[in-house]
């Protein structure tokens, strides 16, 4: 059920086609009072009356008019009220600062070929890197989210390498942190006016996943150890890993990158509201 008195938070929104050829919106809302989720449907006529900015992840909304369908366990929404607009992500100044901090780690890399490749690649795609989200839903799903996530990974890596008795190849760890999600600059699209995120279907047809892309560019450049870390960073095959960490005799570095990535995805600035204050 739903209530017109509850202020809901937008979790995710997407638009698809019905069998009749019309548009249908799918909106998932969270009740901040108990954390429960409400799945909503909006027909094309309702979508045409609403501003896309309404559906930005993190927005606080009130359902003005709707009906609950018990059979499908969803709410057919015909009118919404924006209560509070969420921050879309990093502003331009913040993006520049994060980009500068991220790329400063490249100067800590001793391997000239690897350092040169990273600097050249990031310079070539800097505009995409500065705005790309790190996900559509799971974590850092906002403008500049990939920048924040990648910078967090580099920070966590440095702290952990300084504290560990085991001494990994720092060059490769920094590079794997910088590149493990780099394919996301092509995998996702983000509307800078509304903050809405979607998949780029052309990328998914060509590359399947961002992990495959990152693995491939590193292998092409001869950075096999970095490629292997990227292949394993999701941890399990069912989570999208090319190399499953359940396999035997894997290098410790593979586990390190996975754990660092997971730390940022769980404990970093995972949503735009955390950027405020």
Predicted regions and their residues:
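OB-fold/S1-family single-stranded nucleic acid-binding modules
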Residues: 67-93
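OB-fold (S1/OB) nucleic-acid-binding surfaces
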Residues: 18-44
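Short nucleic-acid-contacting surface segments enriched for D/E, G, S/T with interspersed K/R
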Residues: 45-63
């Amino acid at each position: 059920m739903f209530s017109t008195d509850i202020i809901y938070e937008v979790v995710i929104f997407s638009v698809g086609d019905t069998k009749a050829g019309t548009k249908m919106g799918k909106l998932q809302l969270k009740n901040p009072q108990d954390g429960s989720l409400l799945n909503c449907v909006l027909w094309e006529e309702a979508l045409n009356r609403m501003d896309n900015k309404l559906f930005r992840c993190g927005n606080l909304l009130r359902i003005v008019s709707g009906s609950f369908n018990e059979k499908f366990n969803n709410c057919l929404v015909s009118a919404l009220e924006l209560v509070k607009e969420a921050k879309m992500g990093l502003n331009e100044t913040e993006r520049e600062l994060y980009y500068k901090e991220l790329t400063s780690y490249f100067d800590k890399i001793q391997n000239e070929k690897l350092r040169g490749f990273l600097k050249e690649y990031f310079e070539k795609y800097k505009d995409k890197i500065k705005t790309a989200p790190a996900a559509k839903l799971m974590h850092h799903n906002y403008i500049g989210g990939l920048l924040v996530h990648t910078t967090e990974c580099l920070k966590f890596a440095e702290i952990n390498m300084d504290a560990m008795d085991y001494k990994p190849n720092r060059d490769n760890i920094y590079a794997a942190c910088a590149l493990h999600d780099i394919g996301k600059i092509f995998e996702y699209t983000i509307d800078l006016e509304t903050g809405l995120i979607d998949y780029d279907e052309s990328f998914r047809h060509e590359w399947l996943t961002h992990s495959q892309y990152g693995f491939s560019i590193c292998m092409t450049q001869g950075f096999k150890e970095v490629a292997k870390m990227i292949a394993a960073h999701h941890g399990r095959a069912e989570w999208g890993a090319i190399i499953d960490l359940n396999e035997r005799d894997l290098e410790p570095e593979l586990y390190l990158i996975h754990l660092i990535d997971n730390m940022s995805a769980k404990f970093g600035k995972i949503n735009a509201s955390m950027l405020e204050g």
